[in-house]
Amino acid sequence: MRNFEDLQIAVAGTGYVGLSIATLLAQHHKVTAVDIIPEKVEKINNRISPIQDEYIEKYFAEKELNLTATLDGASAYKDADFVVIAAPTNYDPVKNFFDTHHIEDVIDLVLSVNPEATMVIKSTIPVGYCRSLYVKYAQNFAQMEPCLLYTSDAAD
């Protein structure tokens, strides 16, 4: 049986979903949050929430967190046991289309530096998307769970 203590977890994306997951997991595991926006990374590393959420702000101020942030996805994913993908998937109502390229960019990078990592997609995705990833990558993904958080209760 796998030991789930002292895991190294990378979280791709630091919006409401990604940052709340990273913050909660960082209470018990080493977590590296990855984002492409330098200001967000700097704020997280200085324990300032880049998003307005009272719970995340409270956790940053009061909890012992093993959380760092980086712009370098490859270094974060290289030694990760799990990679939580919380990348944006913008929906275009005119085309009736979810833009999932950010998810696939993360998957491609993870597979190139750490093909043994377990990837968990937490981004909002269209029905059947995980099946298409399985066909494309011949990979098993641990979980598909669309985001259903209220914006003011990200860490609740």
Where are these regions (language model features)?
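A structural signal for isolated positions on well-ordered beta-strands in alpha/beta enzyme cores
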Residues: 10, 32, 68, 118-120
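Redox-cofactor binding/interface segments in oxidoreductases and associated redox assembly factors
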Residues: 84-85, 121
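Conserved small/polar residues in nucleotide/adenosyl-binding loops
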Residues: 150-156
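Short glycine-/small-residue-rich Rossmann-like dinucleotide-binding loops
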Residues: 87-89, 124
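A general structural motif
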Residues: 6, 80, 116-117
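NAD(P)+-binding Rossmann beta1-loop-alpha1 motif at the extreme N-terminus of oxidoreductases
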Residues: 2-48
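Conserved N-terminal Rossmann-fold NAD(P) cofactor-binding segment
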Residues: 36-82, 89-96, 137-143
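Rossmann-fold NAD(P)-binding glycine/threonine-rich loop
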Residues: 97-148
